[in-house]
Amino acid sequence: MAAQVLPGTPDRIGKYYVVHEVGRGSTGTVYLSHDPFYGRDVAIKLYHATVGDDAESRNARRMFMGEAKMVGKLQHPNIVPIFDAGEEDGRRYVVTEHVHGARTLSAYCRAGSLLPIDQVVSILYKCAKALHYAHSRGVVHRDIKPSNILLTQDGDVRIVDFGIALVADSDVSRLEGVAGSP
């Protein structure tokens, strides 16, 4: 697949061909990418922080991969699945399903673009069910907010970015300081 990329955008991340940047946040950049093996589009979050080779970095790498593996086992219709995770040039990345045409709920948090109350109740219900499912499997999202909830073109809801999830009762997660959005 011949991808047109912006200057400064990587051509590839792991085995995935980068198509274009989708968004940029405080912890990383999300790219629409293509998986050549499965022939499907994916979203890749490439984290800004680089990882060294000292003991703390090795532990952080182990935690990241363990958490990605746990979150990757979540299978719920309202949670965007993780397909893969890895590290390239000292930067970690997570590969998820790309939900074509979806918008984050942030787009509906301003006057003039508010959703009808019955739709808001439905969204909250679906989010609560998805979070309950994750919690029942020992995974806590820790950063649920409008920009981490997608509204699909058909009106369904998908929670994204378990990037700072806490895996409860696990030796791969630890909680130090503050996590999530203010």
Description of each model-found segment:
Residues 2-182:
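Conserved ATP-binding/catalytic core of the eukaryotic-like protein kinase fold
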